[in-house]
Amino acid sequence: MVMKSSVEEEEGGWGLGIPEKMRNNANWVDVTQEFKGACKELKLGELLHDKLFGLFEAMSAIEMMDPKMDAGMIGNQVNRKVLNFDQAVKDEAIRVKDLSIPELIGIMDTCFCCLITWLEGHSLAQTVFTCLYVHNPDLIQDPALKAFALGILKICDIAREKVNKAAVFEEEDFQAMTYGFKMANNVTDLRVTGMLKDVEDELQRKVKSTRSRQGEQRDPEVELDHQQCLALFSRVKFTRLLLSALISFTKKETSAVSEAQKLMSQAADLLPAVHATIQYGIQSQNDTTKGDHPIMMGFEPLVNQRLLPPTFPRYAKIIKREEMVNYFSKLIERIKSVCEVINITNLHSILDFFCEFSEQSPCVLSRSLLQTTFLIDNKKVFGTHLMQDMIKDALRCFVSPPVLSSKCSLNNNHQAKDYIDSFVTHCTRPFCSLIQIHGHNRARQRDKLGHILEEFATLQDEAEKVDAALHGLLMKLEPQRQHLACLGTWILYHNLRIMIQYLLSGFELELYSMHEYYYIYWYLSEFLYAWLMSTLSRADSSQMAEERILEEQLKVRSSKKSKKKKKARPLSKEITMSQAYQNMCAGMYKTMIALDMDRKVRKPQFELDSEQVRYEHRFAPFNSVVTPPPVHYIQFKEMSDLKKYNPPPRSADLYMAASKHFQQAKLLLENVTSPDAEVNRILKVAKPNIVVMKLLAGGHKKETKALPEFDFSAHKYFPIVKIL
């Protein structure tokens, strides 16, 4: 039987045959002759088409045992014997004791590189577990290597647990499968950190004993020994600090997050020493049989090849040691940034923090740590605050609804309390989902934002009904007060933010063609930002009205005249930023229309679709939203038709109008007190665009056939227009 011979070959080369249990339970039948007989019934070139085997199955089918298609067959192509840990120890191919310091440094650095490659989306079997030492650390007799191997396993285990718990990864981000390997679960976290500390203390003594005394003649050998001990000490301490920081994130107290931040700062201080001593470690020899996977003592890239499913061979390119320190440096900065979230108490500020953090395109581990720090196992924010309380605080800050004011008669009304409590409870899940969405990678975020609009549309409907019910109750108790569109305004604000983010992220992900820019920028400037401005103004007015009522109540109680102080409006900066964004979008819309008039926008020859099909596809997720109502293509064409103006504007007029919009955005942003990085980024686009638009309005390069260039390097949503 063909299968039998391949099994024997496999057992000889790999020691991984069919498990005994499977052999005993299965009733193996040889179908070779029966299959060949059935094949004879087919004519030459004829294929059997089963209804369960369609085009999709054909495209994803794997021809097993073909080296080009089956990852498990790569092992048969190498001309060396692939050994597992036990075999390698038995054959003395690797040592478990009496390792030199350069060997330890080389093994540790390669292990760090494998750890990073795993965090970047490759499988454990092709990265960390290519290091034979982590297969069974109990057999290692060298204390430094044993403690390090256990430390790496614990780091992997906690990272895997955190990423799984946060659930903000997709198949392209992370592979959590452990392939049956033990993750040092027989040893406690405390024991491993203790072992690393013991090794660290021993190495520190060696570092001190080999240190040069002042004015002493230095022996080159002693100096080299000192540098090597220091290099090993830095790596062991770094492993302990990284592990201790991850352990801190598993605790429920917020003080543990502050502790993790301190540990990360200490770890960052060790990185220069690690980087400076990379050359002291033994260097890997490139695997000449397959790419450039590092082959060195203790590592076998093909040891787990048969554990991989029969898929197209995926080669894991292990990062270089020089890049390792840079990656760890950025990871530490991201984790330190994650720790800052516990200092934020306002829900809107937390949402902004998640958005800003996500814009850096952070790794899956730091994204997951942020999620699990925000919402701990007990479903409380930072383990202490109820999400419902945070939503109520956000409502008070944004729109000051009378029902949440302690000085309002509704505050003691049981029916009103039931209305608002029920509404806030219904808000909890969509807002938790919205925060979780910002933990996904940027491409997946966009897709999920489109889907969550449906939940917010339902909330919008409920908010309007609750507002109406509360207004009815309030009119009976306090006729001078209103409760119109308070909750509705707040939900509408979040609805608009999601819609704006959905459209803008398309520029970042490079989803739009140049000929589509004009209707995307039109929708943003004329519609979404116009609605957002109106919503923010309404929220600001609502706040002011509530403040006036409270001031009048205080005047009645106190006969003293209070000094009037000009109070800073909480929403003023957001209103200014929204105006600036609206002007930038309007400027880009008019620029695109003018460029199209001058025949400087390349348009496709539509065959299977049309502009209407593309337009409807781009705005399809907005169809589930009632407020604001979606603008359909025919409406858009009517609203943006230039022929309704008399006389219709020429391209020069539109360039000049675009220049004025960019100028207005510049003026608004230059008046922002303490401008942040985003303000400066927009100014970098607005200033050159003002100049370019004025040049184009004056007829500059009008006759040139060259198409304009859109440079998104300064800002990911608004390009600098370049005329070549």
Curated annotation (Swiss-Prot):
GO CC aspect terms: cytoplasm; NatC complex
Keywords on record: Cytoplasm, Developmental protein
Coiled-coil portions: none
Cellular compartment(s): Cytoplasm
Similarity comment: family membership: Belongs to the MAK10 family.
Lineage: superkingdom: Eukaryota
Biological role: Auxillary component of the N-terminal acetyltransferase C (NatC) complex which catalyzes acetylation of N-terminal methionine residues. N-terminal acetylation protects proteins from ubiquitination and degradation by the N-end rule pathway. Regulates cell proliferation during embryonic development.
Name assigned to this protein: N-alpha-acetyltransferase 35, NatC auxiliary subunit
InterPro entries, sorted: Naa35/Mak10
Organism phylogeny: Eukaryota, Metazoa, Chordata, Craniata, Vertebrata
GO biological processes: blood vessel morphogenesis; negative regulation of apoptotic process; positive regulation of cell population proliferation; regulation of TOR signaling; smooth muscle cell proliferation; somitogenesis
Subunit structure and binding partners: Component of the N-terminal acetyltransferase C (NatC) complex.
